């Protein structure tokens, strides 16, 4: 018999019905976090073109929602990788200028998978602001339920919050290297199985970081609704891979996006030692000195 459990931080996930009821609350601020990856073979060192979701946002969006542009406004412009976390002081300034801060409850949604919302959720989390939720099912679920949309653009006035930074959550290659042979650590690849096992060479060198396990991020999402699977189902997915709370768990993917969904679920299940490899395979697979395997 499966023992019912619940998400540890239930306020970090809101449903569409809740948002519809609270959409006119002046303390609620809603943000579309959508970004698109157009996969291409035109430049092997970068397997996709990044396309802002601003155009789609302007066509229609959840009423009273603003747009957050992950790559153009919230990523390190000096990095060779698409979504590198910027300096936290710069990130905090950018987010505050876009209206994130006290006393507001921030709602994040995306329209092509929850991972874009969870990426920005973690970016705000590492700054110490906790009044942030993702919309379960995102824009697709909102539309499926027949909820209203609009084209009017929203721009919130600046807000403020006291930063309590947790820079250790987003890690680099040295952390990953030290985790490979560490019996108290585990690496989780959030990409699809064909990439993990080397059939798909999207990121250059085929395969996965040596010793890492594969828990594709989409396995944590219901394929019909686009909503998160139940806490019981999510916990079983991790337990089936012998992931326990005493381990240091580092999540990676292609560019630090899908991994944030796995990390978000782990956090919601009460795991504490959670890390995200920021540049992931976009960095790792391009360096032949870093170990990878296909079995």
What are these regions (language model features)?
Residues 1-295:
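Cytosolic catalytic domains that perform sulfur/thiol-centered chemistry
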């Amino acid at each position: 018999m499966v023992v019912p459990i619940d998400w540890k931080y239930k306020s970090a996930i809101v449903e569409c019905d809740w948002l519809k009821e609270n959409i006119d609350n002046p303390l609620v601020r809603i943000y579309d976090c959508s970004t698109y990856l157009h996969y291409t073979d035109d430049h092997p060192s970068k397997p996709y073109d990044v396309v802002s979701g601003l155009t789609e946002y302007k066509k229609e969006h959840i009423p009273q929602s603003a747009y957050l542009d992950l790559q153009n406004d919230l990523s390190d412009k000096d990095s060779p990788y698409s979504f590198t976390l910027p300096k936290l002081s710069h990130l905090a300034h950018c987010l505050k200028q876009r209206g994130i801060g006290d006393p507001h409850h921030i709602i994040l949604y995306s329209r092509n998978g929850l991972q874009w919302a969870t990426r920005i959720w973690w970016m705000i989390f590492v700054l110490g602001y906790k009044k942030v939720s993702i919309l379960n099912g995102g824009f697709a679920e909102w539309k499926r339920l027949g909820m209203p949309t609009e084209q009017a653009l929203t721009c919130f006035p600046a807000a403020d919050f006291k930063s309590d930074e947790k820079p250790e959550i987003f890690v680099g290659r040295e952390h990953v290297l030290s985790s490979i042979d560490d019996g108290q650590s585990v690496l989780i690849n959030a990409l699809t199985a064909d990439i993990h096992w080397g059939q798909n060479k999207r990121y250059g060198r085929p395969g996965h970081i040596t010793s890492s396990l594969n828990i594709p991020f989409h396995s944590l999402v219901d394929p019909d609704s686009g909503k998160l699977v139940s806490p019981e189902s999510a916990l079983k997915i991790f337990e089936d891979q012998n992931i326990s709370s005493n381990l240091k768990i580092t999540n990676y993917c292609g560019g630090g996006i899908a991994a944030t969904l796995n990390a978000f679920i782990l956090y919601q299940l009460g795991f504490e030692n959670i890390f995200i490899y920021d540049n992931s395979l976009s960095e790792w697979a391009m360096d032949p000195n870093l170990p990878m395997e296909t079995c």
